[in-house]
Amino acid sequence: MSPQTETKAGVGFKAGVKDYKLTYYTPEYETKDTDILAAFRVTPQPGVPPEEAGAAVAAESSTGTWTTVWTDGLTSLDRYKGRCYHIEPVVGEQNQYIAYVAYPLDLFEEGSVTNMFTSIVGNVFGFKALRALRLEDLRIPPAYSKTFQGPPHGIQVERDKLNKYGRPLLGCTIKPKLGLSAKNYGRAVYECLRGGLDFTKDDENVNSQPFMRWRDRFLFCAEAIYKAQAETGEIKGHYLNATAGTCEEMMRRAQCARELGVPIVMHDYLTGGFTANTSLAIYCRNNGLLLHIHRAMHAVIDRQKNHGMHFRVLAKALRMSGGDHIHAGTVVGKLEGEREMTLGFVDLLRDDYIEKDRSRGIFFTQDWVSMPGVLPVASGGIHVWHMPALTEIFGDDSVLQFGGGTLGHPWGNAPGAVANRVALEACVQARNEGRDLARESTQIIREACKWSPELAAACEVWKEIKFEFEPVDKLDVKKN
């Protein structure tokens, strides 16, 4: 009989409702190395103390419910309950708090992102006592992360497979994203790869529609890959989107890609689901396929600052579930992403050990031990004038992906690819020579234009294109 059971038997069961903070707010608690730690941005309803709100989050995402129950006496709540162990006000905001919650490791199934999220964020976000709730960060202990395979291959293995080192990889999303026949789609893939790109990509919503069934697309893209490889002497790839309506169909598509001998497949991990993604990642490791991950639907979850879940949490979850690439914003393009915040979760994707750094939005020190890293993909509204900034921001271990910035070239797809490859090589050379990419960006690109008419034409087309909007989700700073 557990100590708690003995206590219950001694004093008798007392029915009723009691404040969550009496059981789940424990500021004296010292976190364990094996705890999963969570940082929640809590906005309580008027009249709800922050301690009660934080305790409610801990309770409703672990062992608690709205009233006392008889069966509490049949287990040890002290062993299994979540604990709100610290609360702090959010800088520059009124009635917002960061509530830190510790969860015992035994609450979670090994190797299951699905179970982890079902517990931590599955129910509590609809709790009436909270006006809004956002999961800002998680600390995944090595004791839990080691139960996951993680990325199928990781950064170093991918570079070895491709035999490409010392620079970012270049990609292109085929446009228009919907409506092309499989043959015309394959033609665009070939032209881009022949022009100097490393990868081309299915858009996230290209699955198997009436205008282009998946098997036809796979065959024409494989033909384009082999033809471009033969002409350039470089290893090429196309992200064949295996996302489907069922897990069984998804695996059939991945198997077809393997039989065609292509190097990489793709999955929409949020719309497809973490269970499907983990299954696909395991298949990819066992069969030598790289796995590109698109984050379609992420902004529904992560864009609002006071409610939902920050992308750094989704990025950590993806690294655990498995993926070799994931879209991570651009900072300079058309999609949301503040620089320091973006660099924070880029490091969480790539590095083995990341120190706590609130200036970049990192709430906890994260040790991935030996889990392979994930290449961040910069994609969305970028073109050749952005190349110096992208090279400086993301470094070598990244994929820079230009869709309209390749296919929108006035001379065609292959010249668009040439322009991007020349711009990238010029930026890498300038950086290696010690030049300041941020300060000399325009000069570096203009110098390269002298040797590449394709780049000069691209620069002329996109010289006035900028996306200068303030990001919605920004780091917390004190307001004057």
Curated annotation (Swiss-Prot):
The basic functional RuBisCO is composed of a large chain homodimer in a 'head-to-tail' conformation. In form I RuBisCO this homodimer is arranged in a barrel-like tetramer with the small subunits forming a tetrameric 'cap' on each end of the 'barrel'. The disulfide bond which can form in the large chain dimeric partners within the hexadecamer appears to be associated with oxidative stress and protein turnover. InterPro entries: RuBisCO, RuBisCo_large_chain_AS, RuBisCO_lsu_C, RuBisCO_lsu_C_sf, RuBisCO_lsu_fd_N, RuBisCO_lsu_N_sf, RuBisCO_lsuI. NCBIfam families: PRK04208.1. Its cofactor is Mg(2+). CDD domains: RuBisCO_large_I. The modification N6,N6,N6-trimethyllysine is found at residue 14. The lineage of its organism: Eukaryota, Viridiplantae, Streptophyta, Embryophyta, Tracheophyta. Its main location: plastid. It comes from Acorus calamus var. americanus (American sweet flag). This is Ribulose bisphosphate carboxylase large chain. It catalyses: 2 (2R)-3-phosphoglycerate + 2 H(+) = D-ribulose 1,5-bisphosphate + CO2 + H2O; D-ribulose 1,5-bisphosphate + O2 = 2-phosphoglycolate + (2R)-3-phosphoglycerate + 2 H(+). It is an enzyme of class 4 (lyase). GO terms for biological process: photorespiration; reductive pentose-phosphate cycle.
